């Protein structure tokens, strides 16, 4: 029997609708992967929860599956890169290792009223100045506050000194290291609405505002650093966890967007357009978020790379709703052909505000809507309208980025599961009037985490050489339909105005 001497990097990509483990070889190529769909819990309208135990159990099972399928052991794996859905958070008991409540997901709207109370007290501007974020239920702070109130009421005898808080990266790190490491990185911490974007530390005034004890919060580390090692008994050996990133930041890194002005858009559960703004915070005048792309130690000094982001909450989620909610389709993949069976939407416009509206509207009270229905409208028209709405949202954010930067975007790099829809990508190119570039390997999130971990550990020492292995899969150029598509955008904006402020 021959011994496998190849060296690998393991990427863990823990998303909103599913979790994935991908093994990359020493050339930076994907050689194996495992995937598990994640259960979604909707206890009340506008609420969404995940079972953190399921996330951990799936993570562990996927690692085992990848090792079994490839014959690779922990001794072959140089490092683990971890990337996660952001903002989703939980509390757990460090004594038992059990979550105290299901994790509250980033799409969850239960704390909208708390945000409105804080806005009425004039706290929104302070929060934006300190964190770069708008005051919204999207971020972790109000979710952690709600969870703490629930624990105090439902478990009054629990000693809060035993309670730990964290986003999904923190939870999985804690489990991977056998409870030895309670940490996060700056890219994930910057999405909690509790980290000061200038000092790069927890902001005590904001912790006090949301009544969250600092000792519950994880230590913040550079994104590209050694967070600890996996517990030997778990994986048959200790593997360094050498990078932790938010999912959108990991995708930005995979695309090679390491210079100011470079950007990408991920089409996943939501759509997220991020533009690198360099080593200084750029404040948006157009309702974009100022956030951390990643951090690293350079000659012993902490260096932050900042970004502007437009977060759109509902992309794959509205296609999933077509399948699971109203059962108009049997599979996500068939939406492309169904949309192409009709010339247009027959006057139908869809507003994808199933979890409110994100950038650039930031309307927690908006709700989804289908407008323009007449007797001649068919299933295919509605499906096409849903896909078109995804492109319309992205155009709003691209327009905002262009205004903030003063430099029109020349092309758009894309990734994520929904970017496989050729109809949508062509429609997006027509709408923006610029080429849309999709890589051959679309799991950019996992790839970015792998690249970061391999560079941190020294398996690779040339980022640009790694990127040169990335092949362009397809470029969608604007075609003769561009003018008609852009006219539809104006009508869609009218539909959005009808759906805004719906429940207030």
Swiss-Prot record:
Q: Which reaction does it catalyse?
A: glycerol + ATP = sn-glycerol 3-phosphate + ADP + H(+)
E.C. number: 2.7.1.30
Q: In which pathway does it act?
A: Polyol metabolism; glycerol degradation via glycerol kinase pathway; sn-glycerol 3-phosphate from glycerol: step 1/1
Gene Ontology cellular component list:
cytosol
Q: Which organism is it from?
A: Trichodesmium erythraeum (strain IMS101)
Q: Where does sn-glycerol 3-phosphate bind?
A: 16, 86-87, 138, 247
Uppermost EC category: transferase
Signal peptide region: none
Q: What's the protein name?
A: Glycerol kinase
Annotated PANTHER family: GLYCEROL KINASE, SUGAR KINASE
Q: Hey, which family's this protein in? A: Belongs to the FGGY kinase family.
The GO annotation for biological process reads:
glycerol catabolic process; glycerol metabolic process; glycerol-3-phosphate metabolic process
* Annotated positions binding glycerol: 86-87, 138, 247-248
List residues binding ATP.
16-17, 269, 316, 320, 417
Q: InterPro entries recorded for this chain?
A: ATPase_NBD, Carb_kinase_FGGY, Carb_kinase_FGGY_CS, FGGY_C, FGGY_N, Glycerol_kin
Q: Tell me if Chaperone is a UniProt keyword of this record.
A: no
């Amino acid at each position: 029997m021959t011994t496998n001497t190849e060296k690998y990097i393991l990427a863990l990509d823990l998303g909103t609708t599913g979790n994935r483990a991908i093994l990359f070889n020493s050339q930076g190529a994907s050689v194996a992967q495992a995937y598990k769909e994640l259960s979604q819990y909707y206890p009340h309208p506008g609420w969404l929860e995940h079972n953190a135990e399921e996330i951990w159990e799936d993570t562990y099972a996927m690692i085992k599956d990848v090792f079994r399928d490839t014959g690779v052991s922990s001794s072959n794996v140089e490092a683990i890169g971890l990337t996660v859905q952001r903002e989703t958070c939980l509390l757990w008991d460090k004594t038992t290792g059990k979550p105290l409540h299901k994790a509250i997901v980033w799409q969850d709207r239960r704390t909208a009223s708390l945000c409105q109370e804080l806005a009425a007290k004039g706290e929104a501007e302070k929060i934006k100045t300190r964190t770069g974020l708008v005051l919204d239920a999207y971020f972790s702070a109000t979710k952690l506050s709600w969870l703490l109130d629930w624990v105090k009421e439902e478990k009054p005898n629990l000693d809060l000194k035993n309670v730990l808080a964290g986003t999904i990266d923190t939870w999985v790190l804690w489990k991977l290291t056998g409870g030895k490491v309670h940490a996060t990185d700056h890219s994930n911490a910057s999405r909690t609405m509790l980290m000061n974007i200038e000092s790069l530390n927890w902001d005590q005034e904001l912790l006090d505002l949301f009544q969250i004890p600092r000792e519950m919060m994880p230590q913040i580390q550079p994104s590209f650093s050694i967070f600890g090692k996996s517990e030997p008994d778990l994986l048959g050996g200790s593997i360094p966890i050498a990078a932790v990133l938010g999912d959108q930041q990991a995708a930005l890194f995979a695309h090679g967007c390491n210079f100011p002005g470079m950007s990408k858009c991920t089409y996943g559960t939501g759509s997220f357009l991020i533009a690198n703004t360099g080593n200084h915070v750029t404040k948006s005048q157009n309702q974009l978020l100022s956030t951390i792309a990643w951090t690293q130690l350079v000659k012993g000094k902490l260096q932050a790379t900042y970004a502007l982001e437009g977060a759109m909450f509902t992309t794959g989620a509205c296609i999933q709703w077509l399948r699971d909610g109203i059962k108009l389709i049997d599979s996500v993949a068939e939406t492309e052909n169904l949309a192409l069976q009709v010339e247009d939407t027959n006057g139908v416009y869809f507003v994808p505000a199933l979890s409110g509206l994100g950038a650039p509207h930031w309307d927690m009270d908006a709700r989804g809507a289908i407008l323009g229905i007449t007797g001649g409208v068919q299933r295919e028209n509605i499906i096409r309208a849903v896909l078109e709405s995804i492109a319309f949202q992205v155009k709003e954010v691209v327009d905002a980025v262009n205004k903030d930067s003063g430099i029109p975007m020349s092309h758009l790099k894309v990734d994520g599961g929904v970017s496989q829809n050729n109809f949508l990508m062509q429609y997006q190119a027509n709408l923006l009037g610029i080429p849309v570039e999709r890589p051959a390997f679309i799991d950019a999130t996992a790839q970015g985490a792998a690249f970061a971990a391999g560079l941190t550990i020294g398996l690779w020492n040339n980022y640009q050489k790694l990127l040169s292995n990335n092949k362009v899969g397809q470029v969608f150029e604007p075609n003769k339909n561009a003018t008609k598509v852009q006219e539809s955008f104006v009508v869609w904006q009218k539909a959005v105005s009808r759906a805004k402020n719906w429940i207030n």
